[in-house]
Design a protein with these regions (language model features):
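Rieske [2Fe-2S] iron-sulfur-binding domain
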Residues: 3-122, 127, 224
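C-terminal catalytic domain of Rieske-type non-heme iron oxygenases
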Residues: 109-232
Length: 232
């Protein structure tokens, strides 16, 4: 699941919340790591600390943790004393792709790969990132909104739909592994745009909460949208 844009993770820990779990996302050297936002020592949020020598340092007692979550330094004990093996942060699987930091909170292999947002890496596309938006609804309802064609005529009259033509287009679904594929054709009469033309929107929905939508314009150019939801 997504937790942050890559450029949000800088020279200090980034506090985020995923599935009701507070996390601290840190850039440590050439790696991005995600930890439970809790120092193993006295329960201080590790996101209150700082990053030094590619390690995250707790703000309370100065314990240092490396990118694997293992404590490497406790300032209050002599250096010759061993650090307990259990002195580790809870760490989660983390990957960086498409300018987004993705986290899997299970210790097992992720059930599904990161969604295919290949246009974000295609030099033929001009890529724009939109600001994150907070929706007061479930993650499933948020992603469903993008292909819930029944609401277009009512909510988006004159833009994406027409209240005089409320019947949504028929679609045929195909399923491939953890993805749903379908297309929907929007007629020119369902838009009030000056140069409205009939066009087909293609959709690939990737479980659990991602969708890739694209359409080919009359001039041959492809417009693509990539959406993903971070359930907090």
């Amino acid at each position: 699941l997504p937790v942050a844009f890559s450029d949000e993770v800088g020279d200090k820990p980034l506090p985020v919340r995923l599935l009701d779990e507070p996390l601290a996302v840190c850039r440590l050297g050439n790696r991005v790591a995600a930890f439970r936002d809790l120092c193993i020592h006295r329960g201080t949020p590790i996101s209150l600390g700082w990053i030094k020598n590619n390690e995250v340092v707790c703000a309370y007692h100065g314990w240092s943790y490396n990118a694997d979550g293992r404590c490497t330094r406790i300032p209050s004990i002599p250096p010759e004393h061993p650090i307990p093996k259990k002195a580790c942060l809870t760490q989660y699987q983390t990957k960086e792709r498409y300018g987004i930091v993705w986290v899997c909170m299970s210790e097992k292999e992720p059930r599904a790969p990161i969604p295919d947002f290949s246009p974000l890496e295609d030099p033929n596309f001009h890529v724009l990132f939109r600001d994150k938006r907070h929706w007061n609804c479930s993650a499933a309802r948020a992603i469903e909104n993008f292909f819930d064609f029944g609401h277009f005529a009512c909510v988006h009259d004159g833009i994406l739909g027409d209240r005089n033509q409320p019947i949504p287009p028929e679609v045929t679904l195909t399923r491939e592994d953890n993805e749903l594929h379908f297309s929907a054709t929007r007629s020119a009469s369902q838009s009030h745009a000056v140069h409205a033309v009939e066009h087909k929107n293609n959709y690939r929905v990737t479980r659990p909460f991602s969708i890739h939508q694209w359409k080919v314009e009359p001039d041959g150019k492809t417009e693509a949208f990539c959406y993903t939801v971070m359930p907090i």
